């Protein structure tokens, strides 16, 4: 069992079930986001840093028929056109989210542990990014048929952006912040499969 899944199990046991743990995680996030001195969830107005998880509001993009107004994004390297790019974790089933973050944690465990000590403990902005690229993410998600979850985000359409510390990946996995417009995850996945089979 991976580290993120272990932490989710511990949070679920402490809360008296996974549903209660999810409610507690969402309450923790909203409280932390508003707290001025809180660093585990920290305001971040700049571009994405790879390997970090961001939550933000996203306005209707002109070029997209469907979009998520409240993405939870595991950041990748910047797109060639200059947009931020990442995996919208809201689009993934819980098991796939857990598998993905466990996979990344296992790959970078020593590095992440180094970023969660001393002054960097629970300090999302101070923690250094990971070298996690589009190529690696795409290979992983293709195994599940969910590489459509890799999205681009224009800086001008993002607002209220915060970054979450590595120590709290398990909590953010439990949160359900999806606000999908003009479609459903099932419809998007079906359309994506149809596109791949052309």
Where are these regions (language model features)?
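Intrinsically disordered, low-complexity, charged/polar segments
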Residues: 91-198
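Basic/aromatic-rich interaction segments and small domains that mediate binding to polyanionic partners
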Residues: 64-107
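Short linear interaction motif-like sites in intrinsically disordered regions of transcription factors
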Residues: 29, 67-68, 170
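N-terminal functional modules and adjacent low-complexity/disordered segments of proteins
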Residues: 24, 51-53, 84-87, 125-127, ...
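Mixed-charge, Lys/Arg-rich low-complexity intrinsically disordered regions
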Residues: 3-53
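A generic structural signal for residues embedded in beta-strands
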Residues: 55-58
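Short, low-complexity intrinsically disordered segments
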Residues: 26, 64-65, 167
């Amino acid at each position: 069992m991976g580290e993120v899944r272990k932490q989710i199990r511990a949070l679920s046991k402490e809360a008296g079930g996974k549903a209660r743990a999810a409610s507690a995680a969402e309450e923790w996030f909203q409280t932390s986001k508003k707290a001025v001195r809180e660093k585990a969830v920290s305001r971040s107005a700049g571009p994405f840093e790879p390997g970090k998880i961001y939550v933000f509001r996203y306005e209707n993009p002109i070029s997209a028929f469907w979009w998520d107004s409240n993405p939870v994004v595991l950041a990748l390297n910047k797109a060639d056109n200059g947009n931020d790019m990442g995996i919208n974790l809201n689009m993934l089933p819980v098991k796939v989210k857990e598998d993905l973050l466990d996979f990344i944690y296992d790959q970078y465990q020593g590095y992440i542990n180094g970023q969660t000590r001393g002054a960097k403990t629970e300090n999302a902005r101070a923690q250094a990014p990971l070298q996690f690229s589009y190529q690696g993410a795409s290979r992983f998600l293709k195994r599940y048929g969910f590489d459509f979850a890799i999205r681009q985000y224009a800086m001008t359409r993002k607002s209220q952006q915060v970054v979450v510390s590595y120590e709290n990946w398990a909590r953010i996995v439990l949160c359900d912040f999806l606000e999908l417009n003009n479609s459903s995850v099932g419809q998007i996945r079906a359309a994506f499969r149809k596109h791949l089979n052309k």
